[in-house]
Regions:
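Intrinsically disordered, low-complexity segments
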Residues: 1-474
Length: 474
């Protein structure tokens, strides 16, 4: 492929990458009745009369230019027609399985019935950001409910009871405490409910007749206790939940995280990754060689940016009917400018690195680390990272006039993140959306123009040419 970026105003000082991905999706994963459509009968009388699911073009507008179906090659701006939607279903399934952050984003629709499908369920989607200190944060310390330490279920309470005879507060009284099999004598007591001299008065044991100090305690000698095995179980369940959070809970991720086995995509009935590649987008400075009346002097810098790539293909033998889809996306390095590095917030001894504490649970990442405001919101938890993650990763940052808040900012020379409000660990945050509009001269136009060439070499069980009459020579 050859790619040209919309004209940058300046030769931006940042890294841009163009990446490609190819996947195959068996038709049976996106249409439940595909095998019956091909002639399979589970019972002798089963019907094989099925039609491929369709998606009607939106009324009035048809499929618009730049839509997903435009990239599939469907005619645009024409309504009142329909086409089969196996490509759209495969696209959404690939997104769900390979590009969606399962902790922050809901699955998109993947119809598997006989249709018709709704075109608005199938739109262009943004990939997730590459993982760094912030984008790899978890929204919770473990993926599951917090595991409680099993301390038992109950402990008897002494000092509360009900009397069955009449007493006053200066005399001792016989009372029945929780689950008691015999009466207990309170030397001093106070009434809580009921009247002195009345039956079934609720009584609280006191320390002396002349004061109101209460003598109410939980009797831990008779409390139920947890066993060592129950405590071990609590620790191991917590470890499982933490591994689910770190490793993911798609089935293939569970197998890899818990059992150390990487299962082929096809065996787990999911889209299969075939290959791809990554290459840099090169930004070329262009120096003005003559002065103009508009005030730009000689040597004023503009730029153009291009990228080319080769050998991003794949070789694959298919053993069933599949759709093959290729994806191209552009990403930039993630650079920050509004946060206070965690290292600059450390105050106590235990906040420093200690080997003995290296394997504790996930630690909180605070909002001020990515977006400092000088308010109470700074201490809101943004997400959770592994213990001492700040020692393992150093986010890139910018300073000086490159900062977006400088009155004479040069931020159009960079692609650094600039948050207009406090970011949260959410679907919007995790989507890859580099601020390319900030650095190009025409932000309302497409950011990249691509010329893609695919060299198909197919080996198929079909004759080279269809010759009339050769019906018995397949």
């Amino acid at each position: 492929p050859f790619t040209r970026m919309a004209t940058p105003e300046f030769p931006c000082m940042d890294n841009l990458f163009m990446e490609s991905f190819f996947f195959s999706v068996p038709y049976r994963l996106v249409w439940d009745n595909f095998q019956k459509f091909m002639g399979e009968q589970r019972n002798p009388g089963d019907s094989t009369d099925y039609l491929i699911p369709q998606v009607p073009a939106p009324t009035t507008t048809g499929f618009v230019n730049g839509s997903l179906y435009d990239y599939f090659g469907f005619p645009t701006m024409v309504d009142d027609y329909s086409a089969n939607n196996l490509l759209g279903r495969a696209y959404n399934l690939i997104y769900n399985e390979w590009f969606r952050d399962q902790n922050l984003q809901n699955s998109v629709v993947v119809d598997v019935d006989d249709g018709p499908d709704v075109a608005t369920d199938y739109v262009l989607l943004r990939r997730g950001k590459r993982h760094d200190y912030f984008t790899s944060c978890l929204p919770w310390p473990q993926k599951g409910p917090a595991v409680d330490i099993p301390l038992g279920t109950q402990a008897p309470i002494v000092g509360l009871g009900v009397n069955t005879r009449a007493y006053d507060s200066t005399a001792s009284g016989n009372v029945w405490e929780t689950d008691a099999v015999s009466a207990t004598t309170y030397p001093f007591w106070k009434t809580v409910e009921g009247t002195i001299g009345g039956n079934h008065t609720l009584m609280v044991r006191g320390s002396a007749a002349s004061n109101g100090n209460l003598m109410v305690y939980a009797d831990l000698e008779d409390a139920t206790a947890a066993t060592i095995n129950q405590l071990r179980q609590a620790f191991q369940i917590q470890k499982m939940y933490e591994r689910d959070a770190r490793g993911g809970t798609r089935y293939t991720e569970i197998i890899r995280a818990h059992f150390g086995v990487t299962s082929p995509d096809a065996r787990l009935q999911r889209p299969e990754y075939l290959g791809g590649g990554s290459g840099r987008i090169n930004v070329h400075p262009v120096a003005q060689t003559s002065e103009t009346d508009s005030g730009t002097p000689q040597g004023n810098l503009a730029a153009f940016a291009t990228a080319s790539a080769a050998n991003h293909g794949f070789t694959k033998g298919f053993t069933e009917h599949c759709v093959v889809l290729g994806f191209v996306c552009v990403r930039a390095d993630l650079t920050y400018q509004q946060g206070l590095n965690r290292e600059h917030s450390l105050r106590t001894r235990l906040e420093q690195y200690w080997p003995a504490l290296a394997h504790l649970g996930e630690q909180a990442v605070l909002t001020k680390e990515i977006y400092l405001q000088g308010t109470v919101d700074d201490d809101i938890v943004f997400g959770y990272q592994e213990r001492y993650a700040e020692k393992r990763y150093k986010p890139s940052y910018i300073t000086g006039k490159f900062r977006s808040n400088d009155p004479q900012s040069l931020d159009h020379w960079t692609l650094t993140q600039d948050f207009g409000s406090r970011p949260t660990l959410s679907s919007a945050f995790i989507q890859e959306d580099p601020p390319i509009d900030r650095v190009i001269a025409t932000p309302d136009e497409p950011q990249f123009l691509c010329d893609l060439y695919f060299d198909y070499i197919h080996a198929r069980p079909m004759p080279m040419y269809g010759v009339p009459g050769n019906i018995d020579r397949f």
